[in-house]
Design a protein with these regions (language model features):
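Ankyrin repeat A-helix N-terminal signature
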Residues: 111-123, 153-159, 187-198, 225-234, ...
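Start-of-repeat signature of ankyrin repeats
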Residues: 105, 146-147, 180-181, 219-220, ...
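Amphipathic alpha-helical repeat scaffolds of TPR domains
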Residues: 61, 102-111, 148, 217-220, ...
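Ankyrin repeat domain, specifically the short helix-to-loop turn at the C-terminus of the second helix
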Residues: 86-94, 128-138, 164-173, 203-211, ...
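Ankyrin repeat boundary signal
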Residues: 100, 141-143, 173-177, 212-215, ...
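Cullin-RING E3 adaptor/co-adaptor recruitment helices
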Residues: 1-95, 100-101, 115-116, 266, ...
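Hydrophobic, small-residue-rich alpha-helical packing segments that form membrane-like cores
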Residues: 155-157, 163, 169-179, 187-196, ...
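Helix-turn-helix repeat elements of alpha-solenoid scaffolds
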Residues: 74-87, 118-129, 233-238, 243
């Protein structure tokens, strides 16, 4: 009885809040969503009947859209409101005009997809709830401005049930009516996050006939999408190949887009040694490999930019750069100075370079950090403290990039006490482990810049006194050529290494 009385009071209060609101004004609607937050939290019985309380269906649609604007706020009041509407039993009623249903209609689902933040699982939860409200899977609503449809939103938001229902109602798993929107499989792969599970969506689409080699208008295949990814590209590619093997479908590893860019070039541009290895194992043409051009490197930077402030990203980027360099070297592809400068540019834009002497002073004078670092083992006979105090040349002799990369992947830096300690150690390890690569190319560039008139020993002394950031600036001054942003690379010579460029040769730090 007490609960019934509470429910009655809640309903009366809810109805009272509706009085006098001018629904045409967004400010008024947002105030309403804010005012009913406490009420929604204590509501235990049947929810109010939104169909009865809101005779104008567009008001509910406005409120659901406005709720999305509060998704970034603390406690996500928008998500709470959407679920409250869903639990009330409210379902959208399609519009019927001139004897047919209207599908050219922008819904809150479209708006949620456009506003959606990557790595934000709450957005997927909101979209999933909205699909239960807009539950007519025989009507694939399309946003006229963007070309985005409900089916595409389901694929990019991991709403497997909704996507399956659209296919069941006759949509092709390769539905691609508009060049402005990628095909379903491309979207599922693009929005596959390294810390959220997207494999069921990819599996569902492939098993229902999605083409693993489908090209967009720009020639982008699903494998291109995978190879653009920084964090989970190798793992996702492994799953993708495995699923297609089970379905007895082949995946073309050598296909290029309209700009001539192959999956292997994207893997190199993304500095993913595991992915490069997998592609070569799967048949990627290594003999015809051309190092990615500057535009591809910079596009990779733009895709990684949002990860720059994530702890461990810079060390991972630096180690992957070293591993890609070694992988290319071991497969008889020798970097040119221009190639190396492109890698340096990517590292510099992510602010990987620091002042070594300042970092060493900060780290080695912190007694608590030193004590903690002594207890962190990188490998047998080498502690984190050893790595932090050794000179770069000695550290490279005792610690292979692959071993440090494995150390990072197992999150062993988290054994330190504070994030401050971890950030300092990450920066110092980056600076030291990149030193050999930077020095060898800096020396080659310095000799070229001075037309080889300096004695080699004198040049070595000069270069040894430069920081990694200075060496990058030196290489960039000699070898970096800005490319027009809109210019398409339509000739082979634009991608071919310059035959006159110096190669590492006698400057190789491996010698």
């Amino acid at each position: 009885m007490a609960h019934d009385e509470d429910d009655r009071r809640n309903l009366e209060l809810f109805q009272a809040l509706l009085i006098g609101i001018e629904w045409e004004y967004e400010v008024a609607r947002l105030e309403f969503i804010d005012e009913i937050q406490d009420l929604m939290g204590r509501w235990r019985g049947p929810r109010p009947n939104f169909h009865q309380l809101f005779p104008r269906a567009e008001v509910i649609e406005w409120l659901l859209s406005d709720a999305l604007n509060t998704m970034r706020e603390k406690y996500q009041p928008g998500l709470r409101f959407i679920k409250f509407v869903l639990n009330s039993g409210y379902r959208d009623r399609p519009r019927f005009e001139n004897g047919e249903y209207v599908v050219a209609r922008t819904t809150p689902i479209h708006r949620a997809a456009i506003m959606r933040e990557r790595h934000a699982v709450s957005w997927d939860m909101a979209i999933e709830a909205l699909f239960e409200i807009y539950d007519r899977y025989d009507l694939n609503y399309v946003d006229a401005e963007t070309g985005l449809t409900h089916f595409h939103v389901a694929c990019m938001s991991n709403c497997v049930y909704a996507a399956r229902q659209f296919i069941h109602n006759g949509l092709s798993p390769d539905y691609y009516p508009d060049e402005r929107i990628d095909p379903p499989l491309h979207l599922a792969l693009k929005y596959h996050e390294f810390n959220f599970e997207r494999t069921p969506m990819i599996k569902m689409l492939l098993r229902r006939g999605a083409n693993p080699n489908l090209a967009t208008a720009e020639g982008t295949r699903p494998l291109h999408v995978i190879c653009r990814k920084f964090y989970d590209g190798a793992e996702l590619a492994q799953q993708f190949f495995k699923l297609n093997d089970e379905l007895r479908q082949s995946v073309d590893c050598n296909v290029a887009d309209v700009w001539g860019r192959t999956p292997l070039q994207w893997a190199v541009a993304s500095l993913s040694p595991e992915l490069i290895d997998l592609l070569v194992y799967r048949g990627a043409d290594w003999d015809g490999f051309v190092f990615p051009d500057q535009s591809l490197i910079l596009e990779a930077y733009e895709r990684q930019h949002r990860l720059r402030y994530r702890f461990g990203f810079k060390l991972k980027l630096a180690m992957r750069a070293r591993l890609v360099d070694e992988y290319l070297y071991d497969h008889d592809y020798e970097l040119t100075a221009s190639d190396a400068t492109k890698i340096m540019e990517l590292l510099a834009r992510h602010r990987v370079f620091n002042v070594l002497s300042e970092l060493e002073e900060q780290v080695l004078t912190d007694l608590e950090l030193v004590e903690n670092a002594r207890n962190v083992q990188i490998k047998q006979g080498l502690t984190l403290y050893d790595a932090l105090r050794l000179r770069p040349k000695e550290l490279e002799r005792r610690l292979e990039p692959r071993r440090l990369y494995a150390f990072w992947k197992h999150k062993n830096l988290y054994q330190l006490n504070t994030f401050g300690e971890m950030w300092l150690c990450e920066k110092l390890l980056c600076e030291k482990m990149m030193r050999g690569f930077m020095r060898s190319w800096g020396l080659a560039s310095f000799m070229e810049l001075n037309r080889y008139v300096w004695p080699f020993e004198a040049a070595e002394v000069f270069v040894d006194n430069l920081m990694n950031e200075n060496l990058w600036s030196l290489c960039k001054a000699v070898h970096w050529r800005e490319e027009p942003a809109d210019e398409e690379s339509d000739s082979e010579e634009q991608q071919q290494p310059d035959a006159e460029q110096p190669r590492r040769g006698s400057f190789d730090f491996r010698d």
